[in-house]
């Protein structure tokens, strides 16, 4: 299991200060929509220069097939190691993206978002008119058939996803509160024990790290346990 630190702080300077503090640790960095819109591709370059970190660009692409493929190609060429898109864009859109990216010399890992971890079961059903578990199963199979590398999902969906695809299909799980911290705006949260039991490949941790007085110490504690 790998640790991915969410760079969701209020400014680029704060994010870079955190990254410098974590230099030398074996982890990934997640750049979300706010940080990317505010700080741009140059921020990715700065992160690459701050240490030997791999970068997950979390933009959750969602559009018509060719537009998604165009966008995926652009972000792939700035040197990130993982990107994502919404599975609900459909299998044709996902296949179009993968056909485009497989033509590149070095493409990033591509994951599909099943259901945002901010959704409760009832909220998900109100939007998608289906149960969460049935939709996750369907989205996972579609993504696997389209040639993607894995899914962004809650810890509690990780085993199900691997059962309907295969054990090498990556699961990246946000909403992890390593030591029982506040859930914040997440609904489907889990701790480290659950993440390990459910065979999660990546866990994403943000606030419990950057809101702590000693972010490096927390990261080291997490890395020791995973």
Swiss-Prot record:
Coiled coil: none annotated. It catalyses: orotidine 5'-phosphate + H(+) = UMP + CO2. Keywords: Decarboxylase, Lyase, Pyrimidine biosynthesis. The active site is at residue 60. The gene is pyrF. Pathway: Pyrimidine metabolism; UMP biosynthesis via de novo pathway; UMP from orotate: step 2/2. One of its GO terms (biological process) is 'de novo' UMP biosynthetic process. Belongs to the OMP decarboxylase family. Type 1 subfamily. This is Orotidine 5'-phosphate decarboxylase. GO terms for cellular component: cytosol. CDD domains: OMP_decarboxylase_like. It holds the Pfam family OMPdecase. Signal peptide: none annotated. Its EC number is 4.1.1.23. Homodimer. The keyword Cell cycle does not apply. GO terms for molecular function: orotidine-5'-phosphate decarboxylase activity. Catalyzes the decarboxylation of orotidine 5'-monophosphate (OMP) to uridine 5'-monophosphate (UMP). NCBIfam families: PRK00230.1, pyrF. Substrate binds at residues 8, 30, 58-67, 117, 177, 186, 206-207.
